A protein has these predicted regions:
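Aromatic- and acidic-residue-enriched carbohydrate-binding clefts of CAZyme catalytic domains
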Residues: 1-9, 13, 37-67
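Aromatic-lined substrate-binding rim segments of carbohydrate-active enzymes
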Residues: 1-40, 117-122, 126
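Short, solvent-exposed loop/turn and secondary-structure capping segments
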Residues: 30-32, 38-43, 108-110, 141-143, ...
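Residue-level marker for beta-strand->alpha-helix junctions and adjacent short loops that shape enzyme
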Residues: 32-34, 104, 136, 158
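Active-site neighborhood of glycoside hydrolase catalytic domains
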Residues: 67-148
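Glycoside hydrolase catalytic-domain groove-lining segments
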Residues: 138-169
Length: 169
């Protein structure tokens, strides 16, 4: 969310990864577009729902919606160009990237997930890609994309139950 508070204005996130690498820290990055429900709008910038912008009318979040996907691609391309030196394959410290967060609780648009993965790969992301979902069958299978991404689960307070479910996948 803080990476792009205003459309086209980006913070200096590369400095964060430079400092982390200098300190010997590895990074798991959640660039989004959606990072978690605990952030207002799931981390999506508020300007995406600007009803006064003609280009954004009809925008639907977290699905294969052309206005949304074009904004995602623009944002991710700008972000990845800044942090590319920190991808593990480039000698950096970014080892994993989350493509979507708990998407199975929201939708099941596999075309959307595939397009996100394609944006990541087109921009040279050289890190393990993953999705995260709750442990129920409906959410796991709706939100994962095992052809391209490692499937991970959130356990909440049910770690034992979650670990048992994970071993069944």
């Amino acid at each position: 969310k803080y990476q792009q508070l205003r459309e086209g204005a980006y913070s200096d996130i590369a400095e964060f990864f430079r400092l982390a690498r200098e300190l010997g820290l590895l990074a798991i990055v959640r660039p989004g577009p959606f990072i978690c429900a605990e952030w207002e709008g799931g981390g999506l910038p508020a300007w995406l729902k600007n009803d006064f912008d003609e280009e954004l009318k009809g925008l639907q979040l977290r699905c294969d919606n052309p206005p949304f996907m074009s904004r995602c691609e623009k944002y991710l391309t700008a972000l990845f160009s800044e942090i590319r030196p920190y991808f593990l394959g480039n000698g950096g410290n970014i080892v994993m990237m989350q493509v979507e967060n708990e998407y199975g609780s929201y939708g099941n648009d596999k075309v959307y997930l595939k397009k996100l993965v394609d944006i990541y790969r087109k921009n040279g992301v050289d890190a393990v890609l993953f999705t995260t979902d709750g442990g129920g069958d409906a959410t796991v299978f709706a939100g994962n994309f095992p052809e391209e991404c490692l499937t991970t689960l959130t356990f909440g307070s049910g770690v034992k139950k979650g670990m048992n479910r994970l071993t069944q996948l």
